[in-house]
Amino acid sequence: MKFAVALYHGEFEKSAFEKTQKWISALDTNLEYFEIQKTTVTELLENLIAGAENQNAESVIYTWSDCPFLDLELTKELCHQHEKYGAEYTFADGYPYGITPEIIHLGTLKILLQLSKQNPELGEGKVSRTSIFDLIKKDINSFEIETLISDKDFRLSRLEFASGTKFGKILCERFEKLIEAEEKKLGKTLCATEKCELAEKSPEILQ
C-alpha cells in the first residue's frame, strides 16, 4: 500500500515543523508529504483527497505539523495494522495527543467529504484536532476501524504535546529537555511509553 503524509498547518513555530519533517524522513526517505492550511473541515477533506490522488496514494497519514514528538515505531505499527487488516481508519488510543498520527484510506476520505456536506455544523466548522474522528463518529459502525491500544492509558493525565500555542511550545521545550536528560542518564533511547511515563511523573509537565 502506498501512503502519503498530510500535514495540517496552523500559525506554528518553524522548529516544530522541522521536527515533523525529520519524523517523515525517518519513516521512509521516499515518502512524500503535502501541506494543507484551510479553515473548514470540508476544505480540509477536499485537500486531503486531492493530495492523495496527486501522489497516487491509497491512504493518508494525517497529523498537525506542530507535533514534535510523533513516535516513529508507533507510526510504523499503525501503518502495518492499517494495511494488514484493510482498515479504513486507523488510530492509537491511550497515548497523549501528539504522539501518533491518524491514517485514513482514500475511499474513507471521500465518504467523510459527503458526510461533512450533509452535516454542515461540522463541515463548515473550523478545523480542529479531532475533526476527522468527529465525522467518523457520525456513522462509526459503517467503517472498518483499527485501533492500536497503549499498554498504559495516559488519558487521565491530560497530556498533550503540540507546540502551536505559547504554552504548548514551552511545555514541549521542557519535555524535550527531560527526555534528553533521561536518555543520557540511562544510556538508551526511550520508547513512547517510557517518554509518556516520564512526563506523567514530572510536575513541570503536569502543571
Regions found by a protein language model. Give the residues of each.
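Conserved donor-nucleotide/metal-binding helix-loop-beta segment in metal-dependent transferases, i.e.
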Residues: 69-97
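Conserved nucleotide-sugar donor-binding
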Residues: 99-114, 166-171
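Basic phosphate/pyrophosphate-binding loop/patch that engages nucleotide-derived ligands
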Residues: 78-88, 108-127, 138
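Conserved alpha/beta core of the MobA/IspD/sugar-nucleotide pyrophosphorylase nucleotidyltransferase superfamily
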Residues: 129-207
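A conserved hydrophobic position in a structured secondary element of the catalytic/binding core
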Residues: 65, 70, 104, 163-164
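N-terminal glycine-rich phosphate-binding loop and ensuing alpha1 helix
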Residues: 1-37
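Active-site nucleotide-sugar/metal-binding loop of Leloir-type enzymes
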Residues: 45-59
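Short beta-strand-to-loop acidic/aromatic patch adjacent to the donor-nucleotide binding site
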Residues: 56-68
